[in-house]
Regions:
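Structural signal for hydrophobic/aromatic residues that build the beta-strand cores
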Residues: 17, 51, 70, 81, ...
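Beta-strand/loop substructures that line and gate deep hydrophobic ligand-binding cavities in soluble
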Residues: 80-138
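Residue-level preference for beta-strand/loop junctions
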Residues: 2, 47, 62, 93, ...
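Glycine-rich portal/gate segments that line the openings of hydrophobic small-molecule binding cavities
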Residues: 25-29, 38-90
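Short, highly charged C-terminal tails/helix-capping segments
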Residues: 34-35, 141-150
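A short, structured loop/turn motif at beta-sheet edges
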Residues: 14, 43-45, 71-78, 100-112, ...
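Hydrophobic/aromatic beta-strand elements that line small-molecule binding cavities or substrate pockets
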Residues: 6-8, 65-72, 95-105
Length: 150
């Protein structure tokens, strides 16, 4: 299985970033250019829940939507999804993503937001999901600006 990851430092406590990420109403307002809507189709965010992400115009040339099944939740810290439908599922099988929010040592008002993907390309010519990584990191960076209005 191949892996790719990236991270950004956020100027907020990990708990706040976690709450923003897990709340469909809030996450849909953070950066509609990248993520226009999120809904739990089944469940409430626990393992086994299905969450549908509708992507915004900033990434719709690459991915329009992604249906994800929550596999693992470490409360307040990380959530792991397996993509079970949408454009990414056609390019990679499996495609598993983990979003983590980790407090920085010595400063409880900052955290490290990490995106990690584990994947297998569906075809030999399929490139690594660099566009997905870049979009996810841009989205995570948007948390800082949004929190000022939240």
């Amino acid at each position: 299985m191949k892996m790719m990851k990236g991270q950004v430092v956020l100027n907020m406590p990990a708990e706040k970033a976690w709450e923003m990420y897990r709340n469909n109403e809030i996450i849909s307002k953070i950066n509609p250019e990248l993520l226009s809507r999120a809904d739990y189709i089944q469940g409430d965010g626990a393992p086994g829940s299905l969450r549908l992400f509708k992507l915004g115009p900033g990434v719709s040339n690459y991915v329009k939507e992604s249906m994800e099944k929550i596999e693992k939740v470490v409360s307040g810290r990380s959530v792991t999804y397996e993509v079970i439908g949408g454009d990414l599922k056609e390019m990679y099988d499996p495609y598993r993503v983990t979003f983590s929010f980790v407090p920085t040592q010595g400063n409880s008002n900052k955290c490290i937001a990490e995106w990690k993907a584990e994947f297998e390309p569906s075809a030999p010519a399929t490139p690594p999901p660099e566009q997905a990584r870049d979009a996810a990191l841009r989205f995570l960076e948007s948390f800082d600006n949004f929190q000022l209005s939240y």
